[in-house]
Structures are given as structure tokens and as C-alpha cells.
């Protein structure tokens, strides 16, 4: 009989974090989405961590993920479409040779030209063996529990790591909220974000896939974001891509208007005011919101024209003016949000009478 040592149990959780972050920070946000740039030492570290997760090569994983984003929810072209059912999206797509899951590297010319990516792809199986032997055996020897580390830090960790990743393809397209877009099935889910090292804010990710952050709010749990940010401060990463705050607020507010209309349609009979008046006020707020977006588009055009201009002084003057104007527009968006939230609070959410 073999009792697992405390050290072997700890190794399972630590190594789960190592391998999972190799997928989230490396395979996903670096190679699949190019959300930031990494130095060669960091790339090598992330490649080793990702190889330790045993989720196929960077090339295969990232290319398939790009296809998922391009054809999300399409039952014929999305490799793990949730519209084919939970188990298909979770892991069924890997168990048979479905056409949508066949690798097609036409969407990954950058990866095909990446020497490190191609090295890992060519020697993937030997690298998996070498990485596991090089990590698990020394740890097992140091804690005097080789079998415990091999079983917990090896097999059990792999089981947990795989299913945590699979949850993103399955549960994150079924369970949660859609605060940014309803054009696909992706959801934001705080519980899944904890389990998936920040990847659970999937609704945000599907509308803003090139942002290095998934948890964009300061309070949202996203260890992958923190790792990338810390790496940038250490000089190991640079050019972290961030979606402008205005774009994020615009998406959120557009969804709030949709939900306000839905709430009014469902609970309107219980509103303690004239329903026609409530609809008119929401319509007026939406018109003001649309005008703000139009003004924002005009400012972006002015910014583009200023950058095209040859005169450096003109660019400097325009930059200052545009910054002020953009700030004013952000304040207007915040005002629209406050007005809309006040309107929504007036909609009494009582059960619909039968």
C-alpha cells in the first residue's frame, strides 16, 4: 500500500498551475492570438510549460483555436461547436475524425515561420517524454516519493488540466452571462475563471480576442493576465495589446440597451409608470448613445487624418485636442450608462403572471 505524501499532493497543484499557464499564456494568448510579444527565453519557458500540458503542439492547438474563433458556433466549421452538444464540444470532437477538427494551417503562416514552434511540432513526442522525465523524476527524488509525484503530479494533473481546458470549449459556451455580445454563445463565468486561470471571461474574449486580458476589470480573477503583465515589467514581454476603454464601454452599453428592452417586454405590465413613456425614455437614451458613437467615429477619422499629415506640429496640437475630446465622450458614455441603469431599476422584475 502506498500513501501519497503531502509533497506529492502539493506537486500536483503546483504543476497543474505550471502546465495550465503554459496553455493560457503561451498556446492561447501568445501564439493563437498574438496578444503580446515575448522574448525568446520566455517563449522557450512557455513552450516547455505548454508541452508539459500534453494538449498537442502549438501549431495544431493555435491553428484550431483560430478556426474556432473564425467560425464560432458553426456546426460544420467550428472544431468544437457547442451547437453539436456538450460532450462534442467538451471532448467528443477529438475522439473521431470529424472534418471540422482536421488541421488546416493556412490560417497560421506566422507559426509556420516560427522556428521554435516548428521545432516543437517536429519533435513533439520526444519533447513530451523529456519534459515529464525532467520535471517529475527530480521532484519525486527530492521529496522521496517518486511514485506519488508520477501519479499525482503526472497522471492526475493531466486529467485535471485537460478537463479544465475542455470546460472553456463546453461550459463557457453554455453557462454564464453575456455582458458584451450576444452574437455567439460565449459566456463570462467567474467560477470557471477561477478554474481556468482567467479564461472564464469568455464572452469578453470572443468579442475582443486580441486583448492580452480576459478579465478586463481590475477585480476580475485572471492570473494569466497578471503573469503576462509581470513578464512585461521584467523585460520578458512587450507590446501588450489592450482594447480601448471606449470600445469596451460601447459594447457593454449596447448590451444593456438590449437587456433593458427584453426586461420591459417581459415585466412591463408590472412597471409602476406608463409603459409607453418608459419605452420612449429608453429610445431617447439609445438615440443619445448612437449620437455619441457617431461623434466617436468622427474623432477617430480626425485622428487618422492628423497622423497622415506631414506636419509634426499639427499632429502634436491635434493629439492634445483629441485626447480631451475622447475623454469627454467617455464621460458621455458613463452618463448614458447611469441613465439606463436608473431606467432599468424602475422595471419591477416580478414573475410573469400566467
Language-model region placement:
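Catalytic glutamate of the conserved HExxH
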Residues: 29, 170, 174, 206
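Active-site-proximal inter-transmembrane loops
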Residues: 111-116, 175-201, 207
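C-terminal accessory segments of proteins
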Residues: 165-179
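Generic hydrophobic/packing signal
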Residues: 24, 141, 170-172, 189, ...
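Non-catalytic, topology-defining segments of multipass membrane proteins
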Residues: 1-166, 212-354
Amino acid at each position: 500500500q502506498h500513501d501519497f505524501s503531502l509533497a506529492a499532493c502539493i506537486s500536483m497543484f503546483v504543476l497543474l498551475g505550471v502546465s495550465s499557464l503554459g496553455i493560457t499564456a503561451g498556446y492561447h494568448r501568445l501564439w493563437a492570438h498574438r496578444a503580446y510579444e515575448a522574448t525568446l527565453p520566455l517563449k522557450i519557458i512557455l513552450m516547455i510549460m505548454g508541452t508539459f500540458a500534453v494538449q498537442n503542439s502549438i501549431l495544431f492547438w493555435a491553428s484550431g483555436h483560430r478556426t474556432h474563433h473564425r467560425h464560432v458556433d458553426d456546426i460544420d466549421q467550428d472544431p468544437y461547436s457547442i451547437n453539436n452538444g456538450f460532450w462534442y464540444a467538451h471532448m467528443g470532437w477529438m475522439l473521431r475524425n470529424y472534418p471540422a477538427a482536421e488541421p488546416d494551417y493556412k490560417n497560421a503562416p506566422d507559426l509556420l515561420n516560427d522556428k521554435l514552434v516548428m521545432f516543437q511540432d517536429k519533435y513533439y513526442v520526444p519533447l513530451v517524454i523529456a519534459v515529464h522525465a525532467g520535471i517529475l523524476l527530480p521532484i519525486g527524488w527530492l521529496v522521496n516519493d517518486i511514485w506519488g509525484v508520477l501519479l499525482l503530479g503526472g497522471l492526475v494533473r493531466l486529467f485535471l488540466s485537460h478537463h479544465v481546458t475542455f470546460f472553456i470549449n463546453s461550459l463557457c459556451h453554455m453557462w454564464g452571462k453575456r455582458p458584451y455580445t450576444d452574437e455567439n454563445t460565449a459566456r463570462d463565468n467567474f467560477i470557471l475563471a477561477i478554474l481556468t486561470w482567467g479564461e472564464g471571461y469568455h464572452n469578453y474574449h470572443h468579442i475582443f480576442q486580441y486583448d492580452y486580458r480576459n478579465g478586463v476589470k481590475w477585480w476580475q480573477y485572471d492570473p494569466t493576465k497578471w503573469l503576462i503583465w509581470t513578464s512585461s515589467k521584467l523585460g520578458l514581454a512587450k507590446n501588450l495589446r489592450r482594447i480601448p476603454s471606449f470600445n469596451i464601454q460601447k459594447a457593454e452599453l449596447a448590451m444593456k440597451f438590449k437587456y433593458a428592452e427584453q426586461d420591459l417586454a417581459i415585466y412591463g405590465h408590472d412597471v409602476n409608470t406608463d409603459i409607453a413613456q418608459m419605452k420612449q425614455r429608453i429610445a431617447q437614451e439609445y438615440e443619445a448613445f448612437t449620437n455619441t458613437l457617431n461623434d466617436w467615429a468622427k474623432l477617430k477619422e480626425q485622428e487618422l487624418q492628423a497622423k497622415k499629415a506631414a506636419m509634426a506640429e499639427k499632429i502634436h496640437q491635434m493629439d492634445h485636442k483629441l485626447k480631451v475630446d475622447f475623454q469627454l465622450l467617455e464621460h458621455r458614455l458613463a452618463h448614458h450608462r447611469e441613465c439606463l441603469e436608473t431606467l432599468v431599476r424602475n422595471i419591477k422584475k416580478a414573475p410573469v403572471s400566467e
